């Protein structure tokens, strides 16, 4: 999505930066070779060329908003640290319901095993929810999660998502959050520390 190409979201535990071609060959392509991550994200293995093509497509598509998740502690503690060395996962919003433009499907992946269970995924999701509401005008969110991914299901439930459907065919559950006035206020409180900053010079490389 072009809209977030000049946006950096700085939290306490994570930094969210736009997904660029620079992120593909380092960690991202290696992550997606993992059979565990393929299973958890319902993804197919891609060649490096296919990963580049997908990144370019997602950068241009108006219905996909992607941020790479960086470890904020590492990113801030090491002057000159590259984004690639601080990458731990990604967080996505898909705006694919043409009948309801206020609905977004949210996904998060903390790919680095050593970074799981530390609240990085939670803060990444909260920051993305806030961005979706304030910048994209969304008022409803869905998360589709594999039935066996209990940690992810519990995390979304702690963020006020409620289970609304189960698919035995796809072996996944669908959770939903409707952002009422009270939920919006809660979300603002949870993300009051998150700062939105310009990302680099705001220019994205042409595909």
Curated annotation (Swiss-Prot):
Q: Name one GO molecular function term.
A: tubulin N-terminal-methionine acetyltransferase activity
Domain (N-acetyltransferase) spans: 35-180
InterPro entries, per the entry: Acyl_CoA_acyltransferase (IPR016181), GNAT_dom (IPR000182), NAT9-like (IPR039135)
Q: Which domain of life is it from?
A: Eukaryota
List the EC numbers from the record.
2.3.1.308
What SUPFAM superfamilies does the annotation carry? Acyl-CoA N-acyltransferases (Nat) (SSF55729)
Keywords per UniProt: Acyltransferase, Transferase
Name any GO cellular component annotation: protein-containing complex
Carries keyword Acyltransferase? yes
Which reaction does this chain catalyze?
A: N-terminal L-methionyl-[tubulin] + acetyl-CoA = N-terminal N(alpha)-acetyl-L-methionyl-[tubulin] + CoA + H(+)
Summarizing the function annotation, the protein's role is: N-acetyltransferase that mediates the acetylation of the N-terminal residues of alpha- and beta-tubulin.
Q: Which family does it belong to?
A: Belongs to the acetyltransferase family. GNAT subfamily.
Question: Under what name is this protein listed?
Answer: Alpha/beta-tubulin-N-acetyltransferase 9
Species annotation: Homo sapiens
């Amino acid at each position: 999505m072009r809209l977030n190409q000049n946006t950096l979201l700085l939290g306490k535990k994570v930094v969210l930066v736009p997904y660029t071609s620079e992120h593909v060959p380092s960690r991202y392509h290696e992550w997606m070779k993992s059979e565990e991550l393929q299973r958890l994200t319902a993804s197919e293995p891609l060649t490096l060329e296919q990963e580049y093509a997908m990144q370019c497509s997602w950068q241009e598509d108006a219905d996909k908003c992607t941020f790479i998740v960086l470890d904020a502690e590492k990113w801030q503690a090491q002057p000159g640290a590259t984004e690639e060395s601080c990458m731990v996962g990604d967080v996505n919003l898909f705006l694919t319901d043409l009948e309801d433009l206020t609905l977004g499907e949210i996904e998060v992946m903390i790919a680095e095993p050593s970074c799981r269970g530390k609240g990085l995924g939670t803060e990444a999701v909260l920051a993305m929810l806030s961005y979706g509401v304030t910048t994209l005008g969304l008022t409803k969110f869905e998360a589709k999660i594999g039935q066996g991914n209990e940690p992810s299901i519990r995390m979304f439930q702690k963020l006020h998502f409620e289970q609304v459907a189960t698919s035995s065919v796809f072996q996944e559950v669908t959770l939903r959050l409707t952002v009422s006035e009270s939920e919006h206020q809660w979300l603002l409180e949870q993300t009051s520390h998150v700062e939105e900053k310009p990302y680099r010079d705001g220019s994205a490389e042409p595909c």
